[in-house]
Design a protein with these regions (language model features):
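Well-ordered alpha-helical scaffold segments within catalytic/enzyme domains
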Residues: 20, 80-93, 142-157, 191-204, ...
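Extended ligand-binding groove/face enriched in aromatic
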Residues: 57-71, 77, 81, 86-189, ...
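Solvent-exposed loop and edge beta-strand segments that line ligand/cofactor-binding
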Residues: 3, 59-76, 127-140, 173-188, ...
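Catalytic-core region of carbohydrate-active enzymes that cleave or remodel glycosidic bonds
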Residues: 275-299, 322-374, 385
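Low-complexity, Ser/Thr/Pro/Gly-enriched N-terminal "stalk/linker" regions
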Residues: 1-75, 100-120
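Beta-strand-rich binding/interaction modules
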Residues: 472-495
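Solvent-exposed beta-strand/loop surfaces of large extracellular or lumenal domains
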Residues: 487-512, 531-537
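C-terminal beta-rich recognition modules with glycine/proline-rich loops and embedded aromatic residues
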Residues: 12, 211, 289, 351, ...
Length: 642
């Protein structure tokens, strides 16, 4: 377990990287204003939100009825959190003023006892706290707490923080194991993360302790939600209270060994577990996290960093069950996976956590947003088929193109808050030094050194760290060496001199410890095209091959490859080349050109004894995150091999 972590990184790390800074500029210029209009129902032709109107109604500022999902409040919370991080990246007085006005409305919507939730305030005030399984009161509170902490950190304004501290006190008075309290747990984990953020910015131990209560209490009574339903006698969605694995209530967190149930609920819980393990130096809780991490990432995760194999419960299924065309792989789940990975790094600086964080960031998360920032995927498939995907039973959730918005719109604002707080995922600062998890271009000002990273990652493997020391003490600069880099293949120079790093790599990190002055560390990661094969236990991918270059997963689209994608076979020694796209939507991206055989059916018979005709051709593969931006067409990550 690590000591001396310094979590407040947002104001220390500025993203300068062309790739990620481009995303941040897109979010600030397009996505945040677009989502603000969505929340105000100002965009025609997309799903109605009504989220801000709900707050105005609850505040008594206008007349009307509640509209939306029971967790509609969380869309506003995540938007506010994203706005806070955006204001750190690029101050914007007008945006801040609009956010302040939203916060004023939220404050007025809070009830006298500290309670805050527009659904129950407007629609069912008599049912408050009676349906933790289905109704997301604690979930919404958690997201608003995260927003409050972020807004306070960045702007210094504490109005929303005071609102959510009142809500936290209200929750603390109601839930717990003490006499007179309800031993409740959230139906959707998130309150734990919100409370930990309040603890982070206020230092108040009771918030941390309450978060631990919610984690420790889960699964102690697997029948809690059964009893709750019997007691209240009414339902909202008729969720199956007997499916205890759905919300990870089937066992205590220490007894859970497999990633099960709703994938977002799971990774939010795992994130809180990992953070609590770090804060309390709890080896037992960290080991519980390790067990879940190992099962999830080694047996239940897609090559893209997607998790959740089925639409039924938006959930994990069983080991090695990873279908490509009926997949779920919700954007929020991959975001939660990044949260979990980052908190695991706070316990142990282990490259396997940075590897998964990198995989999800460059693939299964940004695939959830269109390149123009105005459309979004909830589900991130690895195979689509026009006429089937989004249309036929069993495939309706797998859309071939991104829609403008969703009734359940959890993913778009989640993408925003992650991208705008990216700096704290790229670096860690500890008492003994700093650690670079992903070699993206940054300007970082730490306590013991300043670091500027020059990089064109993920397209180019050359990365240069410019270090200016601030202390006479020896200090560590740790640089993650991705697991896709073959041992001995990375080139390292320090102040122009070649360095053998064989003895300096610990758990996937190059550890450089010295008194830093004005120094330069240059690394060259070999960015070769790699053929990837799945474990044969993954039946859908047996006999298939996928392609990666650096951290990027590639896919094939019909728009680039005429005919049926299933008709192409890639032979074992196929020639593979790369080229930089010079124009269009994918300008600047590295494309792959791969030799293949194309099979064509002879005649029109459904079945025939005549073998298909084979011809040689060249396929084009594009980065997975870019798919679906050029119209509806076929897409596949895994291609048939020979």
């Amino acid at each position: 377990m690590r000591d001396g972590l310094k979590e407040r990184l947002l104001n220390k790390v500025k993203v300068t990287d062309k790739f990620w800074r481009g995303y941040q500029e897109l979010v600030m210029d397009t996505v945040i204003p677009y989502q603000e209009k969505i929340l105000n129902d100002e965009i025609p032709g997309v799903e109605k939100s009504h989220a801000l109107a709900n707050f105005r109604i609850a505040a008594g500022l206008e007349e009307g009825e509640f509209y939306g999902m029971v967790f509609q409040d969380s869309d506003v919370a995540k938007w506010l959190e994203g706005v806070a991080y955006a204001l750190e990246v690029r101050p914007d007085a007008e945006l801040e003023e609009r956010a302040d006005k939203v916060i004023e409305i939220i404050e007025k919507a809070q009830q006298d006892d500290g309670y805050l939730n527009t659904f129950f305030t407007i629609k069912e005030p008599e049912h408050r706290w009676q349906n933790l399984q289905e109704c997301h009161e604690l979930y919404c509170a958690g997201h608003m707490m995260e927003a409050a902490a972020a807004y306070y950190e960045v702007t210094g304004k504490d109005r929303l923080l005071h609102v959510m501290e009142r809500m936290a006190e209200h929750i603390g008075k109601r839930f717990g194991t003490e006499e007179g309290k309800e031993p409740g747990i959230p139906g959707h984990q998130e309150i734990e993360l919100g409370l930990l953020r309040l603890y982070e910015v206020t230092g108040k131990e009771n918030y941390k302790d309450l978060a631990r209560y919610f984690i420790e209490q889960r699964g102690k009574d697997p029948d809690y939600f059964v009893k709750e339903r019997e007691k209240r006698g009414w339902v909202h969605f008729d969720m199956d209270v007997h499916n205890r694995e759905y919300n990870q209530a089937h066992a205590t967190v220490y007894e859970q060994k497999e990633a099960v149930g709703h994938s977002v609920r799971a990774v939010y819980m795992y994130t809180a577990m990992a953070e609590l393990a770090s804060l309390y130096k709890d080896e037992k809780l960290y080991q519980a996290c390790c067990d879940l991490w190992e099962n999830m990432t080694q047996k239940r995760m897609y090559i893209t960093g997607g998790i959740g194999s089925t639409v039924d419960g938006e959930a994990f299924t069983i080991d090695y069950d990873l279908p490509n065309d009926t997949v779920y792989a919700e954007t929020c789940a991959s975001i939660g996976l990044v949260f979990f990975a980052r908190k695991m790094l706070d316990n142990v600086m282990d490259g396997r956590y940075a590897d998964v964080m990198e995989r999800a960031l460059y693939n299964g998360i940004i695939s959830g947003m269109q390149l123009d920032g105005k459309k979004f995927f909830y589900v991130n498939p690895l195979e689509t088929e026009p006429g089937v995907s989004g249309k036929l039973y069993g495939y309706k959730h797998v859309l071939p193109e991104r829609p403008g918005w969703y009734t359940c719109a959890c993913c778009p604002p989640n993408v925003v808050r992650l991208l705008m707080s990216l700096g704290k995922y790229l670096w860690s600062e500890t008492e003994d030094g700093v650690y670079s998890h992903i070699p993206a271009g940054t300007e970082a000002h730490f306590d013991k050194m300043d670091v500027t990273v020059e990089s064109n990652y993920p397209w180019d493997g050359r990365v240069t760290y410019h270090i200016t020391g601030k202390t006479e003490e020896e200090t560590i600069l740790g640089i993650h060496i991705p697991s896709w880099v073959r041992p001995g293949s990375v080139q390292v120079r320090i102040n122009g001199k070649v360095k053998d790093i064989t003895a300096d790599v610990e758990k996937g990190y190059l550890i450089l410890k010295r008194v830093w002055e004005n120094d330069e560390v240059e690394l060259v990661f070999p960015m070769k095209i790699r053929k990837i094969y799945a474990n044969l236990k993954v039946r859908e991918d047996a006999g298939c091959v996928a392609f990666m270059r650096g951290p990027m997963v590639y896919c094939f689209e019909g728009v680039d490859n005429p005919g049926l994608l299933q008709s192409y076979h890639i032979f074992e020694d196929a020639k593979m080349e790369e080229e930089v796209c010079k124009e269009g939507l994918l300008e600047g991206s590295v494309l792959l050109k791969i030799k293949a055989r194309k099979l064509e059916t002879v005649g029109d018979s459904l079945y025939s004894e005549v073998a298909p005709v084979r011809t040689l051709t060249t396929l084009t593969a594009v980065p997975y995150y870019t798919w679906g931006n050029r119209g509806e067409n076929q897409m596949r990550v895994w291609m048939r091999g020979e």
